[in-house]
Design a protein with these regions (language model features):
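Active-site SXXK
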Residues: 46, 50-56, 70, 76-78, ...
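Short, conserved phosphate/pyrophosphate- and ester-handling motifs at nucleotide-, phospho-/glycolipid
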Residues: 41, 124, 298
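Short, glycine/proline-biased beta-turn/loop segments that scaffold the active-site neighborhood
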Residues: 141-157, 237-239
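Short, surface-exposed loop or secondary-structure junction motifs
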Residues: 82, 87-89, 93-100, 156-360
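C-terminal segment of N-terminal export signals and the immediately downstream linker at the start
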Residues: 13-34
């Protein structure tokens, strides 16, 4: 398929948006249902909510958010849709005491399932979808230069920046500039035209609001429609997203989560409590309609958008993208910048907010106001966390701990069934830990012993590691044991370091390892994690050690199983 006459795709295998639904040929629409119906574990969804509620309290000094709406599901089932905390709590921020000035209790508004949020940078996904639609239709070229649509854009060294580089944040633009300081719309445009990139196009990854503001200008030029009209015509109306728009009307205000008491010096504009208007200063100065921020929506509407993409661009009778276009949004274009994986508009494989849901195909985005969307095509699951974390002031929150905690629980809610039998050994997902699974000492002195088992791993790449080790001196010293893994339809993979990290496809692998010769040899798995993030963890099943046909160890034998020493590992059915 040729998109915009610039990028030609060879026939694609079933991509992330196709994978899960394609097995049954279904393209589900959403409805509420039980965790069991969704194929999720209810205990972990309950823990997701409980953990999210802890961030309503000081964490550590102030609440991370005043409230949130949590939505999680799999396939066509929304198994969790829970409001917590307050949508409107504070009328002001007292910088002298670093406290929030609360509304009287009768004027505070609790979160509801349909509370509408200022999405902040999650808005970038809508702009990106609109751009990919135009690429698909041939009105926009993915590798075309931006200046071919906007001649003024060519100034100040920007003449070679492409549409793809805007979508993947590799244009060279700095993070942002204060457009709100320019008095007129034309003056704001002049700031963009005269802005000089800080790096050559394609030379570095640098996340920038200017990329999506520029893309807005391109879209409006090639379509002859404003961005808010495009959003309505091309996305929200076809998908029935009735609570998603720019510039919500005043009648929506009681159902909108408040954001910040915006005043200098922490805000670029003195506006007081921002409630029902876009929080971002540049988007506000652009009339509330901007490519980088300004969209308001609720959790259900975002779930519909996510389900549409996981369906390959279709929801019910409405198709907004082709499957090939969705594939481009979920495919990493930033292979030259490891750690900054990015599809067209979507961020990929970002543990810092996707937590254990992160895979090379997991797509999502966050917003400064406390919002996030995560889509995992490998498990056909989705998670939305909408919080008002700048209420009453942006300095009260830092990091993405609530997003990570929610994603970790959501990932754990997707069961991993044992390769054999009813249970398998599971490493857990604790931070800053070393979990070990040790077999009893075995006599392998004949030199023919071999370990066989099934292994499943999803590990934060590079930072965390699973190692197979052996000790011949009672555990005083350990040496790595090289091994080979294999799965049906693929060539065996050698692991000469005796270790694995990263993502294995979330499938079971067979494993064999030649065991060192020793009179008393102890084998163990060691899973080590750092203090920041974890993957879904590791599973081992069917552990057995053979010596020329003789079984030295088989965990299916109760006597052998009883001699396994597990620290941090547990037997789990899922």
């Amino acid at each position: 398929m040729a998109l915009g006459g610039a990028l030609t795709l060879a026939p694609l295998p079933a991509g992330p948006a196709e994978a899960a639904p394609a097995r049954s040929g279904r393209r589900p629409t959403l409805r509420h249902g039980s965790a069991a119906r969704a194929g999720l574990l209810p205990s972990h969804l309950r823990r997701l909510v409980a953990d999210a509620e802890t961030f309503l309290a000081p964490s550590p000094k102030h609440p991370w958010y005043a409230g949130a709406v949590l939505l999680a599901g799999r396939g066509g089932t929304v198994a969790l849709h829970r409001p917590i905390g307050m949508a409107v709590r504070y009328r002001a921020y007292d910088e002298k005491t670093d406290t929030g000035v609360e509304f009287p209790p009768g004027e505070q508004i609790p979160m509801a399932e349909d509370t509408v949020f200022d999405l902040a940078s999650v808005s970038k996904l809508f702009t990106s979808i609109l751009a990919v639609q135009q690429i698909e239709r041939g009105a926009l070229g993915l590798e075309a230069k931006v200046s071919s649509y906007l001649p003024d854009f060519a100034r100040a060294g920007k003449q070679d920046i492409t549409i793809r580089q805007l979508l993947t944040h590799t244009s060279g633009f700095r993070a942002w500039i204060p457009l709100y300081g320019a008095p007129t719309h034309e003056d704001k445009l002049q700031l963009i035209w005269t802005e000089r990139p800080v790096s050559a196009p394609g030379a570095a990854y640098l996340y920038s609001d200017l990329n999506l503001i520029s893309l807005q200008l391109v879209l409006e030029r090639v379509t002859g429609r404003t961005l808010d009209t495009l959003l309505r015509d091309e996305i929200t109306a076809p998908l029935g997203m009735r609570r998603t728009r720019y510039n919500p009307p005043a009648s929506w205000r009681p159902k909108i989560a408040a954001t910040e008491d915006a005043r200098a010096p922490w805000s670029g504009l003195d506006r007081g409590l921002v409630w029902g208007e876009v929080h971002d200063e540049n988007a506000f100065a652009l009339g509330g309609v901007a490519g980088h921020a300004g969209v308001f929506s609720d959790a259900w509407d975002l779930a519909v958008l996510g389900r549409t993409l996981l369906n390959g661009g279709v929801y019910g009778r409405a198709r907004i993208l082709s499957p090939e276009s969705v594939e481009l949004m979920f495919t990493d274009f930033n292979t030259a910048f490891p750690g900054d994986e990015h599809g067209l508009g979507f961020e990929l494989y970002q543990h810092w907010y996707m937590g254990a849901m992160a895979t090379p195909r997991t797509a999502g985005h966050t917003g400064f106001t406390g919002t996030s969307l995560v889509l995992d095509p490998t498990t056909d699951s989705f998670l939305i966390v909408l919080g008002n974390s700048v209420h009453p002031v942006r300095s009260w929150r830092s990091g993405s701990a609530p997003r990570v905690a929610a994603a970790n629980h959501m990932a754990r809610a997707v069961p991993v069934r044992p390769a054999r039998g009813r249970t398998a050994w599971f490493s857990g997902t604790a931070l800053s830990t070393t979990a070990t699974l040790a077999l009893p000492a075995l006599d392998t002195s004949a030199g023919r012993a071999r370990l066989r088992c099934a292994l499943w791993w999803d590990i934060e790449p590079a930072a965390d590691v699973l190692v197979l080790e052996a000790s011949a001196d009672g555990g005083t010293s350990w040496q790595p044991v090289p091994f080979t893994t294999f799965r049906r339809g693929q060539h065996p993979e050698q692991h000469p370091s005796g270790s694995v990290t990263g993502w294995s496809g979330r499938v079971w692998h067979g494993l064999t390892a030649d065991v060192p010769a020793a009179r008393e040899l102890t084998l163990r798995w060691r899973y080590t994690t750092d203090r920041l993030y974890v993957g879904r963890g590791c599973y081992a099943d069917g552990l057995r050690v053979e010596d020329a046909g003789d079984l030295l160890f088989d965990e299916r034998r109760p006597a052998d199983a009883a001699r396994v020493q597990a620290v941090g590992w547990t037997r789990e059915a899922d």
